[in-house]
């Protein structure tokens, strides 16, 4: 029968005839047969199935095996012995073909259980291991995977299983797509997926095999062979548990046995896996490894791989199936390559055609990719400005796409930079500390120079002034301003966690200061602003003279001198009027100022509540102007009339002295308070005008005005009750003992008044603007009277500055003790301050910086600075407490240490640390509402373009810093491997050395961080 069937199959009969004859033979084979006849049919079936050149013989062979196996199981068990299986697998040279493996799989399906089956499975466990060690092709390897997936008893056991998994990884690395075209590619992908699926199945059964397989995978991709391994290895990544990622990357990046060339080769080949269409989580592993390399400061590898692979990754955005992974890797590579524009500029020629292709695609995936690509381009243009000729085609291509705001751009640039990655060695070696999570850069303390650092950070955070300095065109006539520009440029764009202001400090040194000793930061600020102002004036005059001397035309009338940068940003004007009380003659003098020095009222004024500092609870009412006084007020009550300018002459109309603010103790509701205050500003100004008219026509008041007077009395009574209640509570606290009172903890300082008279900045400003009697030894020389006379001096603000600087005069000379002392009173700081200007106008100011002095003497202690971006934005968009807007995000600058903070911390610093008191305050003028204000705000928020020399210097220093960090990491890596995970002696490098003294800051050469940083000196 077997001879007949073989002759039919090999004959030249038509296929239909052959099929009919085959059916008859198969029907006969279902009947009882002799053993020899059945074995002959089985041998023919195996021969046709494995060696058939056409489809019909293979199908006939398969049918024969099925029929014989089902109807003659005993004979089939005898035929499908271990010897027969071994002959099938070793029948040819090299690894067995996929048909032989398929025949074995078919035989296993038909093989009955028994000793013969056990012997076959034992043989197959050895043979499949031998097979994968011979590196079969994708088809045979996929057949092995199908065989083992269907018959798990064939999987090698014991130690051979791990070896089998590792050899499967090696096989995947040798895969090559055998056919061209879509069908061949799809088949190749399916084969790779089957093999990787088998690996995943084995890993689930034996998780301990995962890490050795990963080690084998790295050995494959890091070997510098002539022929790179197949991208089919990417199919393995999708089955790796993400929980292992951090540990694997950390161990790999810190492994001393892995050379740089191996790591470079491995990461380069992993990035090529982005083109693998079915790879899940490939981008996550690539990014994790890049972050791991950044953490151990292997920047040379990162630079090389970024420059060689970024264009290839970018090209994959064309293909939707791999677009997501490619875009993730591209974003990370660009956003981390911030030390130089080289990587971004490699992509510039490719961006416009890519945008055109994505627009033409018109799909959800393409649209999303376009938006993210445009955002990425805007970030890079923001980071590397100054190349308009290169950027113009790119900006033209994305002009119709969404433009991210500056806050979003800074957020993206700040979160992924290489220098922001946490170093594995940072806990032991502070030189490797990463850039602050805030994205801000600290200043190194050069030995009691915290007073300089605090002022410089406050000036830098005044965004309008910073932009003005950065926009300065390089001018040899302004050397100090140029040095400040370079300092600000590095604070804005450096990758270092902290830089040294040594060069700028030496140029701006105050002559009467002693080097190495603590100085008054307010005194330094005044000197610095004056130097900058005079330098710019002198430079402008020199330029004008040079221009006139070089002009052939007759000299024209010199133009009026323009305002300097200091005048524009910090300059205001104040009018002082002195009225002789004898002849009522008034002398006026207008002066320019850059800061206001606010003295503390004498102790007897502590209990008095001036109108501007009277605050109601936030939930009841915000600070607002009260109506005019009534005649019913007794002598013991401080009425609103006392808060108004006295009418000196008819030419000097009265000016209201109200000051509005948000009490710092109510910081939790700061956003809602600002919104309510802004909504009431317009109404307040109208009420001010009405009050002044009402005061001049006091005799004609009607019934409605008397009702207002009653409201005033009720409001003042409430305030007095609140004051009495606070006093009672503080008396109860005092009764607990002197040791529990804050005053008792600071014997070396002095307080001018108790907590009953707790002050606000509003009180100090009111005291500054209140009329002053010039009597006795302080009498005024009146030119009209030609003699010394009693007089009254009144101070008014005639023009408010863009940035209002307030200095609280805490240091005074005590004639009794003959030494300088510090006033340690806690002064509450309003977030929003409204100052009166001459003519009845008012101007709102937002708090943006607070310089704090820690200590009891001006000759000692420490300075640090709280600040936020001094950029204007309507109060309604200040954000929430959980997620503040960037303009509402406070930072603490403590020399090299920069951290996130809050207005609540600013408000409560003195209550927690009684020696730490606010000293210098920066307020930014709030623009008036309307279209002009919005245009002005957007203009101010545009980041300036740095000139070429400065950008090149920053880029070179960033590269130098990366090299320094890499060198330092390499020199330390050999030691860190032998250290315990969390040694006690390794803690505290990033802690403040002065915290045990009850202060948030320390004054040591490394500043609040106490670390030894690589120092960039200007």
From Swiss-Prot:
Residues 441-926 form the USP domain. It catalyses: Thiol-dependent hydrolysis of ester, thioester, amide, peptide and isopeptide bonds formed by the C-terminal Gly of ubiquitin (a 76-residue protein attached to proteins as an intracellular targeting signal). The keyword Hydrolase applies. One of its GO terms (molecular function) is cysteine-type deubiquitinase activity. Residues 552-561 have a biased composition (Pro residues). It is found in: Cytoplasm; Mitochondrion. Ubiquitinated by CHIP/STUB1 in an HSP90-dependent manner; leading to proteasomal degradation. This ubiquitination can be reversed through auto-deubiquitinating activity. GO terms for cellular component: cytosol; mitochondrion; nucleus. The modification Phosphoserine is found at residue 613. It comes from the Eukaryota. Its EC number is 3.4.19.12. Induction: By FOXM1 transcription factor. Residues 999-1011 have a biased composition (Gly residues). Keywords: Cytoplasm, Hydrolase, Mitochondrion, Phosphoprotein, Protease, Thiol protease, Ubl conjugation, Ubl conjugation pathway. One of its GO terms (biological process) is regulation of protein stability. The active site is at 450 (nucleophile), 862 (proton acceptor). Residues 544-566, 610-757, 984-1011 are annotated as: Disordered. Gene3D superfamilies: Cysteine proteinases. Residues 673-691, 699-709, 718-728 have a biased composition (Basic and acidic residues). It is an enzyme of class 3 (hydrolase). Deubiquitinase that plays a role in different processes including cell cycle regulation, mitophagy or endoplasmic reticulum stress. Inhibits TNFalpha-induced NF-kappa-B activation through stabilizing TNIP2 protein via deubiquitination. Plays an essential role during mitosis by deubiquitinating and thereby regulating the levels of Aurora B/AURKB protein. In addition, regulates the protein levels of other key component of the chromosomal passenger complex (CPC) such as survivin/BIRC5 or Borealin/CDCA8 by enhancing their stability. Belongs to the peptidase C19 family. PANTHER family: UBIQUITIN CARBOXYL-TERMINAL HYDROLASE, UBIQUITIN CARBOXYL-TERMINAL HYDROLASE 35. Homodimer (via C-terminal region). Interacts with HSP90AA1. This is Ubiquitin carboxyl-terminal hydrolase 35. It comes from Homo sapiens. The gene is USP35.
């Amino acid at each position: 029968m077997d001879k007949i069937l073989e002759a039919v199959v090999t004959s030249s009969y038509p296929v239909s005839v052959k099929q009919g004859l085959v059916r008859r033979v198969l029907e006969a084979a279902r009947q009882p047969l002799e053993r020899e006849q059945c074995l002959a049919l089985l041998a023919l079936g195996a021969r046709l199935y494995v060696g058939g050149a056409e489809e019909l013989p293979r199908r006939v062979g398969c049918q024969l095996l099925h029929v014989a196996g089902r109807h003659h199981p005993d004979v089939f068990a005898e035929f499908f012995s271990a010897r027969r299986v071994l002959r099938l697998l070793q029948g040819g040279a090299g690894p067995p073909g996929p048909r032989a493996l398929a025949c074995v799989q078919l035989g296993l399906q038909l093989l009955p259980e028994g000793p013969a089956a056990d012997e076959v499975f034992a043989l197959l466990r050895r043979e499949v291991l031998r097979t994968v060690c011979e590196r079969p092709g994708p088809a045979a390897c996929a057949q092995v995977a199908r065989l083992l997936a269907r018959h798990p008893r064939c999987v090698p056991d014991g130690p051979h299983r791990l070896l089998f998994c590792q050899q499967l990884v090696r096989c995947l690395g040798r895969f090559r797509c055998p056919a061209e075209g879509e069908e061949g590619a799809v088949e190749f992908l399916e084969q790779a997926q089957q093999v990787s699926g088998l690996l995943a199945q084995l890993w689930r059964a034996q998780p301990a095999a995962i890490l050795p397989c990963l080690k084998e995978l790295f050995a494959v991709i890091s070997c510098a062979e002539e022929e790179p391994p197949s991208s089919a290895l990417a199919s393995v990544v999708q089955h790796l548990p993400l929980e292992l990622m951090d540990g694997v990357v950390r161990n790999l990046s810190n492994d001393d046995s892995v050379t740089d060339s191996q790591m470079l080769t491995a990461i380069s080949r992993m990035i090529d896996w982005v083109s693998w269409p079915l790879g899940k989580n490939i981008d996550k592993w690539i990014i994790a490894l890049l972050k791991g390399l950044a953490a151990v400061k292997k920047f040379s590898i990162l630079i090389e791989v970024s420059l060689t692979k970024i264009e290839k990754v970018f090209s994959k955005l064309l293909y939707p199936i791999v677009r997501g992974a490619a875009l993730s890797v591209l974003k990370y590579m660009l956003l981390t390559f911030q030390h130089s524009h080289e990587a971004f500029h490699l992509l510039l020629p490719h961006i416009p055609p890519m945008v055109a292709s994505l627009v033409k695609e018109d799909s959800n995936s393409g649209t999303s990719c376009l938006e993210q690509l445009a955002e990425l381009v805007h970030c890079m243009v923001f980071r590397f400005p100054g190349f308009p000729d290169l950027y113009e085609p790119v900006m033209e291509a994305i002009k119709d796409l969404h433009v991210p705001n500056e806050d979003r751009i800074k957020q993206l640039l700040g979160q992924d930079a290489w220098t922001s990655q946490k170093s594995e060695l940072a806990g032991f070696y502070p030189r490797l500390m990463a850039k602050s999570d805030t994205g801000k850069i600290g200043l190194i303390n050069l030995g009691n120079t915290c007073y300089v650092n605090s002022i410089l950070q406050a000036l830098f955070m005044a965004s309008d002034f910073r932009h003005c300095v950065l926009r300065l065109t390089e001018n040899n006539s302004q050397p100090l301003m140029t040095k400040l520009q370079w300092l600000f440029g590095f604070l804005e764009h450096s990758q270092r966690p902290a830089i040294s202001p040594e060069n700028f400090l030496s140029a701006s040194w105050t002559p009467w200061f002693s080097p190495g000793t603590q100085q008054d930061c307010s005194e330094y600020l005044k000197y610095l602003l004056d130097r900058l102002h005079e330098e710019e004036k002198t430079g402008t005059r020199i330029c004008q003279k040079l221009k006139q001397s070089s002009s052939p035309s007759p000299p024209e009338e010199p133009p009026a001198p323009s305002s300097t940068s200091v005048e524009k940003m910090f300059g205001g004007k104040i009018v002082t009027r002195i009225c002789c009380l004898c002849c009522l003659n008034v002398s006026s003098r207008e002066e320019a100022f850059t800061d206001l020095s606010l003295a503390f009222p004498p102790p007897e004024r502590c209990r008095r509540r001036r109108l501007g500092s009277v605050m109601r609870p936030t939930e009841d009412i915000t600070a607002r102007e009260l109506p005019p006084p009534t005649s019913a007020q007794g002598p013991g009550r401080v009425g609103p009339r006392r808060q108004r300018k006295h009418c000196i002459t008819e030419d000097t109309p009265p000016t209201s002295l109200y000051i509005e603010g948000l009490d710092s103790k109510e910081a939790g509701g700061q956003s809602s308070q600002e919104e309510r205050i802004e909504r009431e500003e317009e109404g307040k100004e109208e009420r001010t005008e009405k009050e002044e008219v009402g005061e001049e026509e006091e005799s004609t008041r009607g019934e409605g005005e008397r009702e207002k007077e009653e409201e005033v009395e009720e409001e003042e009574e409430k305030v007095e009750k609140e004051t009495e209640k606070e006093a009672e509570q503080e008396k109860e606290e005092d009764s607990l003992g002197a040791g529990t009172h804050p005053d008792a903890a600071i014997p070396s300082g002095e307080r001018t008044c108790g907590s009953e008279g707790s002050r606000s900045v509003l009180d100090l400003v009111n005291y500054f603007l209140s009329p002053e009697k010039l009597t006795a030894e302080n009498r005024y020389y009146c030119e009209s009277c030609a003699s010394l006379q009693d007089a009254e001096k009144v101070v008014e603000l005639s023009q408010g500055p863009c940035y209002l600087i307030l200095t609280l005069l805490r240091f005074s000379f005590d004639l009794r003790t003959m030494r300088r002392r510090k006033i340690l009173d806690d002064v509450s700081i309003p977030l929003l301050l409204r100052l009166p200007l001459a003519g009845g106008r008012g101007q709102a100011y937002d708090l943006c910086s607070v310089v704090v002095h820690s200590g009891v003497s001006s000759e000692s202690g420490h300075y640090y600075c709280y600040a936020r971006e001094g950029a204007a934005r309507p109060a309604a968009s200040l954000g929430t407490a959980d997620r503040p807007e960037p303009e509402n995000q406070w930072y603490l600058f403590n020399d090299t240490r920069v951290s996130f903070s809050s207005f609540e911390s600013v408000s409560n610093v003195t209550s927690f640390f009684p020696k730490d008191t606010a000293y210098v305050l920066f307020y930014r003028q709030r623009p008036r509402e309307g279209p002009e204000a919005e245009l002005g705000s957007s203009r101010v928020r545009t980041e300036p373009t740095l000139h070429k020399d400065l950008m090149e210097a920053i880029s070179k220093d960033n590269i130098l810093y990366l090299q320094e960090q890499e060198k330092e990491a390499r020199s330390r890596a050999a030691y860190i491997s032998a250290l315990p995970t969390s040694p006690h002696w390794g803690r505290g490098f990033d802690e403040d050395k002065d915290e045990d003294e009850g202060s948030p800051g320390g004054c040591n050469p490394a500043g609040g961080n106490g670390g030894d940083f690589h120092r960039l000196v200007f």
